[in-house]
């Protein structure tokens, strides 16, 4: 049995894809894979922040098209890159184990969010990270920083930036625990990560029962439950890439905590909820953030 797998061609994308395929191999040892590498708009356009490009699903659209056209059976993505609603005819069927979902301050010196020097140049092209950072540390300078993980790390090491706000998951997957820069995790109560950060997913056509069955058996249950809550939050919060909103679910002992936040104009608002039903918790968190945004 051979499964054709569409993925982006970056080093990190290929590592993430292999991680998920290893989970599939564990439940279906005889399955074989053929990689279909796709170059996306987000990979090609590197000269401006993502929110200025004006394309929805900038890292996922072309990869999913490979499945819709029959060029691949499965599309693999970082869950955080998927919009709240998938292209009709597609479903998320597989979930990797979750890497650390937090954002980090990456620097040569080992700065934390609160030990960054006044006037430090901090790189990020994420609206969410930039708005929360300005709210927490209005005395640092936020500058756009695009490129793959290696490129961004290189700009820190070369001294072009004093630090950058990055996803811990990508750094750990790429470098293990020996990254060339020092990492200081940021608590979600300070800068809530984007929904889905740290989870890699498999997207397939609806109705592909045999493939959906394999991927569901290979999925990590905790990641799937947390993703359900965070996707529900994303669907109901009503915020696009121009709005600084984050949300993180943590599932333990049959219950779920959810930290969500919104930042704008130098102010930030963070809430924390608990519950048992993932969808209900995600919806409640979205409703609270919507109320805050409407009153801001």
UniProtKB/Swiss-Prot annotation:
<dbReference type="GO" id="GO:0004418">
    <property type="term" value="F:hydroxymethylbilane synthase activity"/>
</dbReference>
<dbReference type="InterPro" id="IPR036803">
    <property type="entry name" value="Porphobilinogen_deaminase_C_sf"/>
</dbReference>
<feature type="modified residue" description="S-(dipyrrolylmethanemethyl)cysteine">
    <location>
        <position position="241"/>
    </location>
</feature>
<protein>
    <recommendedName>
        <fullName>Probable porphobilinogen deaminase</fullName>
        <ecNumber>2.5.1.61</ecNumber>
    </recommendedName>
</protein>
<dbReference type="InterPro" id="IPR022418">
    <property type="entry name" value="Porphobilinogen_deaminase_C"/>
</dbReference>
<dbReference type="GO" id="GO:0005737">
    <property type="term" value="C:cytoplasm"/>
</dbReference>
<dbReference type="Pfam" id="PF01379">
    <property type="entry name" value="Porphobil_deam"/>
</dbReference>
<comment type="pathway">
    <text>Porphyrin-containing compound metabolism; protoporphyrin-IX biosynthesis; coproporphyrinogen-III from 5-aminolevulinate: step 2/4.</text>
</comment>
<comment type="similarity">
    <text>Belongs to the HMBS family.</text>
</comment>
<keyword id="KW-0808">Transferase</keyword>
<dbReference type="InterPro" id="IPR000860">
    <property type="entry name" value="HemC"/>
</dbReference>
<dbReference type="InterPro" id="IPR022417">
    <property type="entry name" value="Porphobilin_deaminase_N"/>
</dbReference>
<keyword id="KW-0627">Porphyrin biosynthesis</keyword>
<comment type="function">
    <text>Tetrapolymerization of the monopyrrole PBG into the hydroxymethylbilane pre-uroporphyrinogen in several discrete steps.</text>
</comment>
<dbReference type="Pfam" id="PF03900">
    <property type="entry name" value="Porphobil_deamC"/>
</dbReference>
<dbReference type="GO" id="GO:0006782">
    <property type="term" value="P:protoporphyrinogen IX biosynthetic process"/>
</dbReference>
<dbReference type="InterPro" id="IPR022419">
    <property type="entry name" value="Porphobilin_deaminase_cofac_BS"/>
</dbReference>
